[in-house]
Amino acid sequence: MTSPAVTSADITGLVGIVPTPSKPGSEAPDAVDTVDLDETARMVELIVASGVDVLLTNGTFGEVATLTYEELLAFNDTVIRTVANRIPVFCGASTLNTRDTIARSLALMGLGANGLFVGRPMWLPLDDEQLVSYYAAVCDAVPAAAVVVYDNTGVFKGKISSAAYAALAEIPQIVASKHLGVLSGSDAYASDLAAVKGRFPLLPTADNWLPSLEAFPGEVPAAWSGDVACGPEPVMALRRAIAEGLWDDARAVHEDIAWATEPLFPGGDISKFMPYSIQIDRAEFEAAGYIVPGPSRHPYGTAPAAYLEGGAEVGRRWAGIRQKYVATLAEP
């Protein structure tokens, strides 16, 4: 294994995760060529110009599960060309098996990606030995790639254990993991941080960045946000306040973000959100009005109306607080 050009030291600040805009009619099961590349370029330019530090593509709401191979490459080619080496780009390469993930990873790196955003096969859950072997195999096969691990309990049929994190920390190409951060009633973040021994950051959600940083000062250099697709200004204001040590300001932004995102989980229950997360997030992006996300792709096109309304309410609230932070960030 070799060390990639992008290292864990480069994963600081705000890591934006983007959706994959679709054309009208993309919800049809026989739709072809569904990616709106013009909207993709517009979205990426807006987000990069806002000052986001790192970009990830094709996670769950980025619809890595619904894009064809050709669509995935066309989308990421547009992202990479639009970013134009201004910030690191990690392209989503998750598939149902190791060989397809490696093939996809090689193609994405060939487009000019700085690294890969990689989840694990989930048809059957992987035990720790299989999980570590999988990531080691991908890194061995694509030695130029920096890798961000995708730790999503709902999608991958279980959380990555602290023991597995300790083994992953021995793979130099792994530069971060997309995590949730500090959670009430759980010591997983503390255990996982101890396991990786500072070799790469465990990225909390932006709405959990401040609590995670307060619990573990100096150990949380970055956080991730999909809400950048609703307008990055609130999370960029949080980033600035944290970077400048303005803790009262950071608390105020954190509270605004918590209020805006409160309706996302139906009844406050993430287990109800996860089966419909693509659709709910799509409703949020649509209501925020910052980008034109288009419809989600088949078969993830329907959800309970109340769940979609919760997502839309997040988008509306986000659009409201965004106006305040557009003005705040314009101040010297």
Curated annotation (Swiss-Prot):
Domain of life from the UniProt record: Bacteria
Record note on temperature dependence: Optimum temperature is 45 degrees Celsius.
Disulfide-linked positions: none
Reactions performed catalytically: (3Z)-4-(2-carboxyphenyl)-2-oxobut-3-enoate + H2O = 2-formylbenzoate + pyruvate
Keyword line: Aromatic hydrocarbons catabolism, Lyase, Pyruvate
The protein's enzyme class: lyase
Pfam family, any one: DHDPS
GO-annotated molecular function: 4-(2-carboxyphenyl)-2-oxobut-3-enoate aldolase activity; 4-hydroxy-tetrahydrodipicolinate synthase activity
pH dependence: Optimum pH is 7.5.
Record entry for activity regulation: Not inhibited by sodium borohydride or sodium pyruvate. Unaffected by EDTA, EGTA, Mn(2+), Mg(2+) and Ca(2+).
Catalytic residues in the record: 178
GO-annotated biological processes: phenanthrene catabolic process
Marked site: Involved in proton transfer during cleavage: 150
Function: Plays a role in phenanthrene catabolism. Catalyzes the transformation of trans-2'-carboxbenzalpyruvate to 2-formylbenzoate and pyruvate.
Family indicated by similarity: Belongs to the DapA family.
Name assigned to this protein: Trans-2'-carboxybenzalpyruvate hydratase-aldolase
Species assigned in the record: Nocardioides sp. (strain KP7)
Higher taxonomy: Bacteria, Bacillati, Actinomycetota, Actinomycetes, Propionibacteriales
